[in-house]
Amino acid sequence: MGYLVKLFKLVVWMLVIGLFSIPSLVSYVIFYDTVIPHSVIQYPVYFNYTTGLNFPTAEVRLDHFSIDPRLPGTSLLQIKMPHSPRNSAMGNFMVSVDFQDRNQRSLKQVKRTVLLPHRSPIHEYLKLIVCSPLYFMGILEETDIVNVRLFESETFAKSFNSITTLSVRFSVKNTPAQAIVKIYSKDIEFYEATLAFASKLHGMRWFMYTHKVSAFLVFTSLFWFTGITSTIITYLIVSSTSETKATRR
């Protein structure tokens, strides 16, 4: 008989643990989705070479901008360029990006000087000899990828209107809606360009994003313990109230 009582208690405890584990998991998912923004988002940049323009210009629609504009972030313009004599002889050139809101008002303007990485002729010849089989097979390409750092640890917004709990799409007054990208050179040759944004996480956000398993165990246990404690306290209060009423009767 004692064995059955112990087994019954074990089953009850397992049911309690199971019942409180589901809300704990759901709570952590909601908490993670609310606290952690999308870390990186990229947009392709398509430049316009229409006759009459002095330099290549692109209008990038920042649809579904899921980076929290209140958090410090980094923005990069990545340009994939062929390692051609024309690009090598071009020297320095300027890049500008104008971030605008939905009403086409400028939020932030950035201008940067860009220079292709220099390589000596000896370095180029040695690389061509060593990597020639990979070039013939199409595994390697004679390209240069230039990363133009537009800004770092800066924010678009200082105040916000509302945040939706189950989404990382923020209704923020100064959220960028588009970016006007200009390259002040008609001599440049490139394959493609990408505008990228990345959130810079600190403190708890950094811990939750970089240590996902540990954060999951810690916060899920915390939510589970909170649920169990609240239930026990509520049960004790209700039981004591019921006993008091029964005694008065």
Swiss-Prot record:
| Species per Swiss-Prot/TrEMBL record | Schizosaccharomyces pombe (strain 972 / ATCC 24843)
The record ties this protein, via PANTHER family, to: BERNARDINELLI-SEIP CONGENITAL LIPODYSTROPHY 2 HOMOLOG BSCL2 PROTEIN, SEIPIN
BP-aspect Gene Ontology terms? lipid droplet formation; lipid droplet organization; lipid metabolic process; lipid storage
Which InterPro entries does the record cross-reference, listed alphabetically? Answer: Seipin
Family, per entry: Belongs to the seipin family.
Q: What is this protein called?
A: Seipin homolog
Task: List cellular component terms (GO).
Answer: endoplasmic reticulum; endoplasmic reticulum membrane
Where in the cell?
Endoplasmic reticulum membrane
Q: Which domain of life is it from?
A: Eukaryota
Q: Does the keyword Transmembrane helix apply?
A: yes
Q: List all topological domains (Cytoplasmic).
A: 1-10, 234-249
Q: Which residues lie on this side of the membrane: Lumenal?
A: 32-212
What does the record give as the function of this protein? Answer: Involved in lipid metabolism and lipid droplet (LD) morphology, number, and size. Facilitates initiation of LD formation, and ensures that vectorial budding of LDs from the ER is directed towards the cytoplasm.
Where are the membrane-spanning stretches? 11-31, 213-233
User: How does this protein lie in the membrane?
Assistant: Multi-pass membrane protein
CDD domains from the xrefs? Answer: Seipin_BSCL2_like
Pfam families attached here? Seipin (PF06775)
Which UniProt keywords are given for this protein, alphabetically ordered? Answer: Endoplasmic reticulum, Lipid metabolism, Membrane, Transmembrane, Transmembrane helix
